[in-house]
Every structure is written in C-alpha cells, then in structure tokens.
Amino acid sequence: MKKALLLLNMGGANSLDDVEIFLTNMFNDPYILGIKNKFLRKFVAFMITKGRLKTAKHNYEQIGGKSPLCELTAKLCEKISSLKSEFDAVDFAMNYTSPFVKDVLKKYEKFDEIVLLPLYPHHSQTTITSSLADFKKAKEELKLKAKISLCEPFYDDDTYNKIIISHIREAIKDTDISDVSLIFSAHSLPRKIIEKGDIYEKHINEHVQILSKMLKEQGLNFKDVSLAYQSRLGPVKWLEPSLNEALAKCENKKALIYPLSFCIDNSETIFELVIEYAKLAKELSFSFYKVVECPNFSDEFASFILEKSKNAREFSL
C-alpha cells in the first residue's frame, strides 16, 4: 500500500514573473472574492491585479524577487521525509502558484492513500476550504481513486503551541521583557466573511487565549499580550484592531511580533512585518521591534507534522 503526505498552502510568487499569476489566481478565487458570477469575478480580479501589480512587484524586489514559501516548504518536506514514517512520499502543493495541486497529484495517481495537511493552524473558507476545493477539482479531473484523509486545524494542539512558545523564548533570550509588548499578528479578513459564518476569528481568539495562558505558566511575563490584524486591503471593513493601530498605541515603544496565522515564512512576514512595519515602528520611535520566525522546517515542527498526520481522518470530497 503506497501512501503520501501532501502539505497544502496558498502559494507565493517564485519569481517576479509569478507575481501577476499569484494575484490573478488569488483574486479569482470565489472563496477570496465572493462574486458568484465567474465572468464578473474574473474581470474584477483582473482590475485589482492591474492596480496592485507594480506595487506588489516592488515589494517582492525588496525580499529578493520571490517569496520564500516554496523553498521553505520543500525543506520541511525533506526534513519530514528524513524521519521514520509510514509515508512513501512527502510533498506539497499550492493554490495560486506552482507547484499546483493537479501537477503534483499526477505523481501519485497510483498511490492508495493521500493524507492532506493544510498548513493553516486556523480554519477559514479563504484558506482550508479553498485548498480542499482546489484539491477536489484536481482529483476529479485526474480520476484519482486513492483514499483521502484530512488533518484538522491545529491551533489548539499543545505540541504545536509549545513550538510557538519555544520560538518566542528564543527570540527574546537575553532580553528584559518586562516592558516589551507581545503582539500576535494575524492575517485579517473582511468582516463580512466572518458575519457569513467563517470561524477564523473564533479560532484566532481562542489561540491567543491558549498561548497567553502558556506564556504565564512558563514565566514569560511580557508587559502585555495582545492581538492585532495585518494585510488589510481595500475600503471594506476588516477585522480589528489593525497592527498599525496596535503599534501606535504601544506606549512603551517595545514590541515583539509573532505571525500567528502562518507556519511558514512568506512575503507577509518577511516583507510586511519585518520591513514595512519595522519602518512604522522606527517612525514611532520604537527602541525595540522584532518579528519571531515561523516554525518553518525546524526539527520540532517536522516531527509535529508527522505526528499530526497520524490523526488524519478519512475525508469525502
């Protein structure tokens, strides 16, 4: 019996030429841009992409011309593959840029089971639901007969949260944190998506509560711990408070940022948080501003993913 573990994620531009592909595919996703008429959605996606392309390319140029997401995920797969497991293959696929799901699945047409693990700690229709819909379409087009199993969101998993605490501890070693504010920065969503029943905000709030308790239990006593949202786009109402607002209200001018929505570093961590918000912190006269790295391909995260995969349940697409 041949078995594969497939990690799912959104994707990120692998080159400057990929930026337009990424934006077009993302904004044409009905789970992102909720316009039912596909022709109208395609037109709106084209207009948004056209308006953002120049700025987006400039942003990518500042981080080496590409997102680190695919490279880091490939290293995570290699790390997992080096561990003893029941899997004959460990791979990854993306929604909006290569490697696309359909292309990856072609390698596993003769496999008996594929275990899906979306690399999103929290559930949202814009992430997990979208990834699974993409997978379902590819599976049907390829007429794949393999059994499909799915791993659930893991924001409340004790092992995962211990990894987060460990990364936070490493980031502030030799630092007096009694006057440092810890801000958990989550990717924002339009408020209307939450109002339609998306449970993302609920998961985020629960996650912050869990981590806040663990921090106290481990003696990591920051001045305060709070939640803020990043990556707002357009004039609609988004989840609040924004990270801009949180930094502006930070009277002690010292902040440690943890990117709560991500397991793997990407343009929204290494550009938006590390570069853009660092500039804002400097303008606000911060004396300490630091962003914690995501778990990425660390040994403990690779081991966690492998252990988590054992709890996958058969899933009907």
From Swiss-Prot:
Pfam family, one: Ferrochelatase
GO MF term set: ferrochelatase activity; metal ion binding
Binding site for Fe cation: 187, 268
EC number, as in UniProt: 4.98.1.1
Enzyme class (EC, first level): lyase
Annotated Gene3D superfamilies: 3.40.50.1400
Catalyzed reactions per annotation: heme b + 2 H(+) = protoporphyrin IX + Fe(2+)
InterPro entries, sorted: Ferrochelatase, Ferrochelatase_AS, Ferrochelatase_C, Ferrochelatase_N
Primary site of residence: cytoplasm
GO biological process, one term: heme biosynthetic process
Pathway entry: Porphyrin-containing compound metabolism; protoheme biosynthesis; protoheme from protoporphyrin-IX: step 1/1
PANTHER family: FERROCHELATASE, FERROCHELATASE, MITOCHONDRIAL
Protein family (similarity comment): Belongs to the ferrochelatase family.
Function: Catalyzes the ferrous insertion into protoporphyrin IX.
HAMAP family (UniProt xref): Ferrochelatase
Entry protein name: Ferrochelatase
UniProt source species: Campylobacter concisus (strain 13826)
Gene name of the encoded protein: hemH
